[in-house]
């Protein structure tokens, strides 16, 4: 009993001292001995088409914009992997794919337990440290929401997925892709209570409105804007004007290695069935983003009105970005800017004198685990990769040399620096882009001999020296790289090219 009391007291003192050291003081509205709560908002497939990142001139995201203006807005943040499963596994386990071997999409319930036993899921770590942990909807990739569920969460509830939301629409004939029926852009007339993301937001708001007996870790996942783009009519109707297309170069792929093109699965989800399909898909994406912003607002408004407002750290991230025509792609699954760049915001009410800033240094989402640990005074496990980015909460202009590392399949890596991107694929082919002069990554400089020393230095200094073998599973894996299934993606890419040629849809941009 005495030992437990002493341990709890020590934890509180550590949290208090950590807050003072890192952030320079605690808000006078919060009790100094309160361990901070955490509200983690996880959005699916959200790219930079948000107001605070300026990705599209017609986007409407007032709630997320307000949060970005209130906290620290990391404008050069990047996912660890441009796919739902590997990105979330890396963030929630705190380990890079090249060290875990979790490269493709998994159902973690069917992975050999020995491959995962050395990792501690982030919610479980918080629960072991006295937090009440609550998970709502898509926090892990959907098949993994039951992974160690009873261990991780005091309370967990999964709401509707995109597949279920298809039942909301009566006209199921608009499948604009010739070979795939997943991408749909369509409003639904159903009441809000029929939408899973709305219900997740309402559940979170109810939780936040109640007094809690101990600090909480509340993770709220929103599935939109993941395909299918099905949202209430009110959100669709805000985007009835002609939709501006993003900057696109017709021959953009001419200097891209074949492995880069096939690895990105460029032709898998291109909507070309109708003449206006591209615009309709972009309209659907913007409307889906707008609906998600409303749901984020519901949660943030509830927190603001709650007794927890002055003692809750808010963190918002997306698992990766999304292409909407750039480089002929309407998906993620690439090592290019549209797929790797992600919204990322941290608001800590104890950081009041330094909040309201933007940070343009390269930040990887692999750093979320250590950062939340440091902000709450919890010790991170020794194996955890990344670093705490609390120094950039104190000084958003602090230079950062280390690039963000993005992995898409074993042997395929991207390094995102402040002004450069360097990609290297498993076969040795490369890409290099100067973002200061070429923000859309249209000119691959990798074959220019003037940049050979720079490429050599980047590769030697920052690319992984060792790669864990791909973890096996009791089920067939999705999105396995050609390094582990030779030529599969290349051959798939070639088949799609033939199909598009046969229907005279190739090339879709030139």
Show which residues each predicted segment covers.
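A contiguous, mid-protein "functional segment" used to position or interact
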Residues: 449-484
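N-terminal secretory signal peptides that target proteins for export/translocation
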Residues: 1-8
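Formylglycine-dependent sulfatase
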Residues: 7, 16-18, 28-425, 429-430, ...
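Short, solvent-exposed loop/beta-turn-alpha elements that line the ligand-binding surface or hinge
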Residues: 487
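Hydrophobic membrane-targeting alpha-helices
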Residues: 21-25
